[in-house]
A protein has these predicted regions:
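Short, conserved, GDST-rich strand-edge loop motifs in beta-rich repeat architectures
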Residues: 1-24
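Gly/Ser/Thr/Pro-enriched helix-cap/hinge segments flanking short amphipathic alpha-helices
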Residues: 24-27, 35-54, 64-184
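Carboxylate-rich, polar loop motifs that coordinate divalent cations or form catalytic acidic clusters
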Residues: 31
Length: 184
């Protein structure tokens, strides 16, 4: 799931492939959720829709502009990288967690964001599919929210850490047991 336009909702993105070397390629499917709660199949209109024998996708902000770019791994061909060129006035926030008592990459840490009456959760994972690895960062779309009231991190070590008044549109480095986040 990816916040395609830094809104608060997440839109699903799918890749297709088989667990054997296919003799043909598959269409990549892209769906966006509409206001009425139904998904719209945007595959034919989407510039990242291509035929391939793909295995997984991952989302990362390669150019540090605040929006997520897409990497699709393929079974028998090179990975494809798609830069997000969408313009948006919506806000976002990223966190890079660093464990001291927990593992250094904070894999398994859960962050809970509170902004206004909204709440979001994210878990640090190392990968989500065959031939992919994620950046060890959490990215949250905030919509029009101008600040994050708090972020609470539940570390794998069992430590719970809360930071407040987090500025949007920045990458914040949170070190386990250090009471202040570094901002980039």
């Amino acid at each position: 799931m990816v916040p395609a336009s830094e809104e608060q909702k997440k839109d699903p993105a799918f890749v297709n492939g088989r667990n054997y070397l296919a003799k043909f390629n598959y269409e990549q499917n892209v769906f966006f959720i509409q206001e009425d709660g139904y998904f719209y199949d945007w595959s034919a209109l989407n510039p990242i829709a291509f035929f391939g024998n793909s295995r997984s996708s991952t989302f990362v902000d390669f150019d540090d502009d605040g929006d997520l770019d897409v990497v699709v791994t393929n079974y028998s061909s090179k990975a494809k990288v798609f830069k997000n060129l969408q313009q948006s006035e919506n806000n976002w926030v990223r966190f890079r967690l660093e464990g001291t008592r927990s593992n250094r990459n904070a894999i398994g840490a859960v962050a809970q964001l509170q902004f206004g009456d909204q709440q979001r959760f994210g878990t640090v994972v190392s990968g989500s599919g065959f031939l992919s690895q994620k950046q060890y960062e959490l990215h949250f779309g905030l919509g029009a929210a101008e600040k994050v009231d708090s972020v609470t991190v539940q570390w794998p070590s069992g430590i719970k850490q809360k930071l407040t008044d987090i500025a949007p549109n920045k990458l914040h480095r949170i070190i386990e047991e250090v009471p202040v986040a570094e901002t980039k």
